[in-house]
Regions:
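Terminal, regulation- and interaction-focused segments at domain boundaries
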Residues: 1-32
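Short, flexible, solvent-exposed loop/turn segments with mixed acidic/basic and small polar residues
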Residues: 1-4, 64-71
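Short beta-strand-to-loop capping motifs
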Residues: 11-15, 78-83
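Short, conserved charged micro-motifs
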Residues: 18-22, 84-90
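A common structural junction motif
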Residues: 28-31, 95-103
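Short, hydrophobic/aromatic-rich segments at coil-to-beta transitions
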Residues: 39-45
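Short connector loops at helix/strand junctions that flank enzyme active sites
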Residues: 42, 51, 71-75
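A short, structured beta-strand/loop element
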Residues: 50-68
């Protein structure tokens, strides 16, 4: 275990809670999906990862409207504890890849 201070990373995402959890659990399956424990009506979870831990907290789900387009909106906070910057970068890359949307 490392003596690294916890690192908080916040993200503003256009996604609802159900879709977030469905995709999130696939990031490092089965490592995450086999041990994740939800708290606060599925708005938080915590799990061990590579000798440290990661906590995820979701804001209340809201709506973002851009002209006629209506999108779900959720603020996501990831808290990394006892992980090196290399490990955090690795998880962040997996996170971004999992939630990447096809664009054109």
């Amino acid at each position: 275990m490392s003596d690294n201070a916890p690192v908080l990373i916040s993200k503003d995402m256009s996604i609802g809670h159900a879709d977030f959890w469905r995709l999130f659990l696939k990031i490092d399956a089965p490592v995450i999906s086999d041990q994740v424990s939800y708290q606060a009506a599925m708005r938080r979870c915590h799990f061990d990862w590579q000798g440290g831990s990661i906590s995820v907290e979701l804001s209340a789900e809201s709506i973002r409207q851009i002209a006629a387009l209506v999108l779900p909106q959720t603020d996501v906070t990831l808290r990394y504890a006892d992980l090196s910057s290399t490990q955090i970068d690795e998880f962040e890359k997996k996170f971004e890849r999992q939630f990447q949307r096809a664009g054109g």
